């Protein structure tokens, strides 16, 4: 699979230079799905951009999503005509946009789509993620039919988690490439 067919789906406010997604983009040439507005995300706009990117891909794709990018993946998968192009999805630290504090900041993303994903997926959750309880992450993995990986106490599994290039995550991504 071409590196540009591995699509990076950052969450709200994008992923900064020290985030594992940005490091993977720089090191491996993976393609970030650029959204029009990272600060005021609109589910319809973000989903349309993902639809366009997958449709334009010249072969199968694998998704590597973080936070709101996971919620986007589930919503998009429920409505797309291009699910067959997705070989798999790595879903990392989904944001619980149904929580009142997050729903107040990120409008229009609730409810979370909870149908089984039409492609293989691995969901990585943290026991002390400030944006999603461990129980919620487990529940989303079950609803989506994703294999759940308990990543211990790693916060939001982002730059602040001190993961660097996050080789563990890259190994999980490669399990999806082999399937």
List each model region and its residues:
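Post-His helix in hydrolase/transferase enzymes
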Residues: 159-174
């Amino acid at each position: 699979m071409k590196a540009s067919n591995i699509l990076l789906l950052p969450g709200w406010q994008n992923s900064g230079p020290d985030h594992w997604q940005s490091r993977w983009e720089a090191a491996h040439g993976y393609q970030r799905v650029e959204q029009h507005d990272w600060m005021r995300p609109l589910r319809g706009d973000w989903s349309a951009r993902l639809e366009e990117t997958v449709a334009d891909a010249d072969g199968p794709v694998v998704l590597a999503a973080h936070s709101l990018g996971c919620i986007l993946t589930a919503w998009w998968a429920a409505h797309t005509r291009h699910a067959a192009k997705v070989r798999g999805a790595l879903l990392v630290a989904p944001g619980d946009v149904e929580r009142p504090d997050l729903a107040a900041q990120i409008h229009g993303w609730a409810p979370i789509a909870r149908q089984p994903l039409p492609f293989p997926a691995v969901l990585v959750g943290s026991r002390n993620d400030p944006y999603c309880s461990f129980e919620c992450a487990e529940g989303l993995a079950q609803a989506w039919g994703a294999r759940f990986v308990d990543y211990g106490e790693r916060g939001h599994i982002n730059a602040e988690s001190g993961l660097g290039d996050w080789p563990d995550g890259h190994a999980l991504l490669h399990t999806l490439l082999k399937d």
